[in-house]
Amino acid sequence: MKGEAQPIGRKKHEIRLIGGKNHEIRLIGGLWKRTKLKVLDKPGLRPTPDRVRETLFNWLGHNLTGWKCFDAFAGTGALGFEAASRGAVSATLVEQDAGLVAQLKLLKTQLNAEAVQVQRGDGIALLKAQRDLDLVFLDPPFDAALFDPALRAAVSVVKPTGLVYLEAPKPWADEDLLPYRLKVHRHLKAGVVYAHLLVLLSA
């Protein structure tokens, strides 16, 4: 596979951070399975829990070879790096916070993750410029009014067979998703997080 990286050894798990406290995320499957990555801890940052991420990628299947993925609110980058670990041909990670962007770039370098692109900017605006995506990750700040514009942007750029992953502080039912031409394919609750895998109504 183009851009294929080698699994990293134990000593390479440690990444020098720019500043602030840090914690770890663990990649669950694929090329970098069990790799632990240190990530910068920021106020309001809410990484997708390991259990939720594992369930999501069980839903998706273990092999994402050739998929084009886009994470509009990347945060720690856990979802995008997991997709790249499982063979995605591209995983675009967008984040507005400068410190998190710098950290995502360090992780990309550490993993030699050529399939990963890191961009700083407005995730929704950059999402609108995409075409024919296989998978869009939407995990916006829960206290921001971003769910409506994010869903509208996502549904306009995914393939007819594409998928949208949505994390939210409340469950979204099919009737809530009708204006976006989406429906719930799979869902789960983990603590205060509701995770949804959505498909187009025409799918």
Task: Please name every model-derived segment.
Residues M1-A203:
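Class I S-adenosyl-L-methionine-dependent methyltransferase catalytic core
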